[in-house]
Design a protein with these regions (language model features):
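A cross-family phosphate/adenosyl-ligand binding-site feature
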Residues: 1-118, 123-406
Length: 406
């Protein structure tokens, strides 16, 4: 699905459409933009024309020479339609079959088999209006998809829900759908499975202002959690500190800080888990003693005695009964060799090997290795794509185990 039609309406968030179009182009999508007349008063068509590298469509009665019925040809051309911002007005029109300008006429002609996303944006009172809620419910029943608004400072100076989701989040939603749509009908193996995932980094406090930690962003674990939810799993995410929003649709979201806290939470959920994915970057060591007051600087060296933290994945490997265990090996050298050692030592079913230098980045190259020593290498994919590829390997292991038992 590489052709995206972006509809820009007259909400103040229309200025963000420039970033959305730019991000989509960087992802390799073909982008065409349709604007309402009101949208052109907020952001100039030339800006979006330059970013999309395509003509902008506004007027049904454009006098430029063309030989197509454009509202039909554009509806046919698009693989995905994204309305951003999606205002109270556009939702009401589409829900009630009104087609009185170029954008709404195109939307009336888009096949029901094509995904149409609305990125909601409006004043909080409009957002909570029962008429809007009824229209959204109606459109959802027809298969339309909605990207919820976020809380924040609105144009009307309210601080409330109604602000359009950030362009990065909107594009990520499109990316996730695009990948998910390729596999959603092929497998239902994960539907109803209880999946426990750890993500993020841990913090080991030295004193009130200092701690030991690492550079993990948590993006891989959060992407896995969202992908698993999308594939029908019941997901519990145990997360160390990150700057990320919790994925939607989780059964449980548990925040922790230290390795010991993470161990205790994993242990409490593990018994009833079908699949455990250990994606967190857990500190191997912690200070033996926590100083309640700030350690003062002195002229001499400072020695901090460290003690081992429990190896969460290894401990769960010992307790493993019916669970499938998947771990990660972030290495700086002998990557596959070290990953294979961890696979065997920790009693894992799958291990994902990668170079530790890529920690925190949006894309990565990984090698997925299974306990039968078969492996697959995936080069330079974003973490959403990697998440689905990892889960496809989990599905293949579950299928194989089921066939062997039968």
């Amino acid at each position: 699905m590489k052709n995206i039609l972006v509809g820009v309406t007259g909400g103040i968030a229309a200025y963000k459409s420039a970033s959305i179009v730019s991000l989509l182009k960087k992802k390799g999508y073909n982008v065409k933009v349709v604007m309402t007349e009101n949208a052109t008063k907020i952001i100039g068509p030339l800006t979006l024309e330059t970013l999309s590298r395509n003509r902008i469509y506004v007027d049904m009665w454009d006098t430029n020479p063309h030989y197509e019925v454009e509202h039909i040809s554009l509806a046919d051309w698009a693989d995905i339609v994204l309305i951003a911002p999606a205002t109270y007005d556009i939702i009401g029109k589409v829900a009630n079959g009104i087609a009185d300008d170029m954008l709404t006429t195109i939307l009336s002609a888009v096949s029901v088999r094509k995904p149409v996303f609305f990125a909601l944006a409006m004043n909080v009172n409009m957002y909570e209006n029962p008429i809007l809620k009824e229209n959204i419910t109606k459109l959802k029943s027809y298969g339309y998809k909605f990207i919820e608004a976020e809380e924040g400072l609105l144009a009307c100076n309210y601080v409330a829900k109604g602000r359009m989701s950030e362009p990065e989040n909107i594009v990520e939603e499109i990316e996730r759908y695009n990948i998910y749509s390729k596999i959603k009908n092929s497998d239902t193996v994960l539907k109803g499975k209880k999946i426990l995932i750890t993500s993020g980094r841990t913090k080991e406090n030295i004193d009130p202002i200092r701690y030991l930690s690492n550079n993990s962003s948590g993006k891989m674990g959060y992407s896995l959690a969202q992908a698993a939810v999308d594939l029908g799993a019941k997901v519990t995410l145990i997360s160390g500190p990150t700057n990320l929003e919790a994925p939607r649709g989780l059964e449980n979201f548990v925040s922790v800080e230290s390795a010991l806290e993470m161990y205790d939470k994993v242990d409490s959920f593990f018994k009833d888990t079908d699949i455990f994915i250990a994606c967190a970057a857990v500190a191997d060591y912690r200070p033996k003693e926590y100083k309640k007051e700030k350690i003062k600087k002195s002229d001499s060296d400072l020695l901090i005695e460290l003690v081992r933290n429990p190896d969460i994945l290894a401990e769960m490997g010992k307790k493993k009964d019916k669970q499938l265990l998947l771990g990660f090996a972030a290495e700086t050298n002998n990557i596959k060799e070290n990953a294979l050692k961890k696979l065997e030592k920790k009693n894992l079913d799958i291990i994902v090997a990668n170079n530790a230098s890529t920690m925190g980045r949006d894309s990565n190259t990984i090698e997925i290795i299974k306990k039968d020593k078969t492996s697959i290498e995936i080069n330079q994919k974003n973490k959403i794509e990697l998440a689905y590829n990892i889960l496809l390997e989990v599905i293949s292991v579950l299928k194989k185990d089921k066939n062997e038992k039968e």
